[in-house]
Amino acid sequence: MRKRISAIIMTLFMVFMSCNNGGPELKSDEVAKSDGTVLDLAKVSKKIKEASAFAASVKEVETLVKSVDELAKAIGKKIKNDGGLDTEAGQNGSLIAGVHSVVSAVKIKVGALETTSGISNELKTKITEVKSKAEAFLNKLKDGHTELGKKDASDDDTKKAIKKDNSDKTKGASELEALNTAVDALLKAAEGEVEAAIKELTAPVKAEKPSQNN
């Protein structure tokens, strides 16, 4: 995100350098392109800043969702005294509870994104989709609490719940896979909003067609 902000600052600088401030009188926050198009830099900069902040928040959600893949690698494992991992089959209750906590945090963060003002209908739809998929996953874990909500949850049942590339996904992994797909789509849309805002500054001026006087 720091690199993105630096790029935005550079873009604004280039706009100042390339714009023609001659012609009609402009307000302090306005510049004019060579074709006469007037840009309100305050509004455009605000749009870029808001879109970037929203995309950063979505990235946080995506990072949480993807972290479940790393947690799934600990199924049937324990820490050894040398810092590595050793086998400890059938003791996955705490691991499942940790995944539940992560996805619950996703649901809360997505709920906060729903309250963001000024976002597009496309983003609103994709936010709702992520929230719905998170709820579906949490409900699936709740439905399987008999097998999953105990200290000695088996490796097989745990894989079915939190390992999204497992062959059997009947205890939550299928819902987790759907959540991943939904959050990927939301992040792509959010980043698209940033690019669109930047493009408003950098879109090339259309060349005027030469007059054809006979």
From Swiss-Prot:
Signal peptide range in chain numbering: 1-18
Superkingdom assignment: Bacteria
Name under which the protein is recorded: Variable small protein 24
Subcellular location: Cell outer membrane
Other facts: Genes for both Vlp and Vsp families are on (usually) unnamed linear plasmids in B.hermsii HS1.
Region called Disordered, residue ranges: 146-172
Pfam families found in the cross-reference section: Lipoprotein_6
Lipid modification (S-diacylglycerol cysteine), residues: C19
UniProt topology in membrane: Lipid-anchor
Membership in a protein family: Belongs to the variable small protein (Vsp) family.
InterPro entries to which the protein is assigned, alphabetical: Lipoprotein_OspC, OspC-like_sf
Keywords: Cell outer membrane, Lipoprotein, Membrane, Palmitate, Plasmid, Signal
Function: The Vlp and Vsp proteins are antigenically distinct proteins, only one vlp or vsp gene is transcriptionally active at any one time. Switching between these genes is a mechanism of host immune response evasion.
Keyword Lipoprotein: yes
PROSITE patterns per record: PROKAR_LIPOPROTEIN
Main location: membrane
Lipidation (N-palmitoyl cysteine): C19
A GO CC annotation given for this chain: cell outer membrane
Lineage of producing organism: Bacteria, Pseudomonadati, Spirochaetota, Spirochaetia, Spirochaetales
